[in-house]
Amino acid sequence: MDSASIDAIHMNGIKSKYLYDILKGIVREKNYDVLETINVSEFLAELLDHMVNTIPNELFQTKVNNGRHTVGRKEDSEENEEAVYGTDIDDANDVHTRQLDDLKRISTHLTTNFKDKSQLPFTIVRICELCFDPFHYFKTYELDKFVNALQKCCLVRGAWRRYELKDVRELSNSQSDKEHIDCDQNDVALSKIPWLDEKMVSELTPFIKEIDTIMSVNLSFEDDEMDDDDDDNLKNQNNDRIITHQDDNIIVEEYYENEDQDDENTGFSNQVINDNNDSQEDDDEDSDYIEEDEGDEDEDDDDDEEEEEEEDGDEDEDEDKHFDIKVEEEAVKEDANTTRNELMNVSNNSDDSSLQNDTGIAISSQNDTRDLSKRRLPLSDENDGNYANPASFSKRNKASES
C-alpha cells in the first residue's frame, strides 16, 4: 500500500476534510491556484488548530501521552522507545510545555499579522508541507525539531502573492526603466525582489546602512580609502625630480612643494654646488699625492737595481778567489810528488851524489820558474817574504840556494 492510500485512510491525522483537501492539492499536486480562491481566515483557523493541538498531542510520541499516536511509523516507535521513555516525567512535562508554548506563540503571530488581514505568509507552501506530512521530514519523537522548523517558516512578515513569469518580467522591466538600469534576467544581482514594496524597502534601509558600517569597521575599508586619498594628495602636491651628475657620480633629489619654499630650494641647490667644488678640490689633492708616490717608487727601484749589481760583483770576486785557491793547491801537490820521486832516485844512485844534487837543484829551479809563470803566488807574512814584491822574491831564492 503506497503513501497515497495510507493518506486516504487516515488523512495523515488531519481531522478536517476541508483542510486535508487543500493541503493535499498544494503538497501532492502542486496546485497553488487554490491559494487565490480559498477563504484565508477559515483556512488559517483550521490550519492553526491542527498545528497547535493535533500534531504535538496526537501525532508525535511524547511521555505526556504515553507514546500513543494515531499516525506514525512503527519502526520509529520500536527503534527509539528509549528516546521516548528514557527521560524523567517532570523533565518531559517541562519540555512538552515549552514546545506547546512555542506553537501558541507561532499561532498568535500568524493570527495577528495575516489572518486578521486576510493574507497568507509568503512561506505558506513550506508551512503546508510540514503540517500535511511531518513524518516525511522528522521522526515520531522529534517534536522539538518540528517546532524549530515552524518557527523559521512562520515568524515572518512578508505576504504571499502569486506571480506569474510574465508579471515578474513586466515588474522588473518597469523598475529598470524607472531607475535607468538595464536589467538582465539572467543576472540575479540586477533583478528586483518582486514581493518587496516601498514600505519594506524604507524599513530595510537603516538596517542595510548599519551592516555597511559594521563591515567597513571590521574590514578597514575606510582606512584603506583614506590612505589612498592621502597618497593622491601627496602625488598632486609634490613634484619630484632627480638630477644625475655623470662627472661626479652623484644623484641629487630636489623637492618643490609650495611657492613659499623657493628660498629653501635655492639654498639647497647652492649647497649642492659647494659640495661639487669641494669634491673637485679633493680630487686635485689626491692626484698630487699620487704623483709624489710615483716618484718615490722610481727612486726605490733604482736603489734596488744598484744593490743587485753590487751583490753580483761580490759573487764574481768570490768565485775568482775560490778558483785561484784550487789552482794553488794543485800546484803544491805536483811539487810534492816531484820532490818525492827525485829523493827516491837520489837514494838509488848514491854514487853519483854531486850530479844528483846539481840535477835536483836544476829541476827544482825549473819547477819554481814554471810555477811562478803559471800561477799567482798568495800573500804571506813578513817573515816568509812578499811574493808579489820582486825584491822579496829574490831574497827567497838566495836563501834557498844557500
Curated annotation (Swiss-Prot):
GO terms for biological process: negative regulation of DNA damage checkpoint. Regulatory subunit (R2) of the histone H2A phosphatase complex (HTP-C) consisting of PPH3, PSY2 and PSY4. GO terms for molecular function: protein phosphatase regulator activity. One of its GO terms (cellular component) is cytoplasm. Residues 320-337 have a biased composition (Basic and acidic residues). Residues 345-358 have a biased composition (Low complexity). Keywords: Nucleus. PANTHER family: PPP4R2-RELATED PROTEIN, PROTEIN PHOSPHATASE 4 REGULATORY SUBUNIT 2-RELATED. Residues 258-402 are annotated as: Disordered. Regulatory subunit of the histone H2A phosphatase complex, which dephosphorylates H2AS128ph (gamma-H2A) that has been displaced from sites of DNA lesions in the double-stranded DNA break repair process. Dephosphorylation is necessary for efficient recovery from the DNA damage checkpoint. This is Serine/threonine-protein phosphatase 4 regulatory subunit 2. Residues 266-277 have a biased composition (Polar residues). Residues 278-319 have a biased composition (Acidic residues). Signal peptide: none annotated. InterPro entries: PPP4R2. It is found in: Nucleus. Pfam families: PPP4R2. The keyword Nucleus applies. Belongs to the PPP4R2 family.
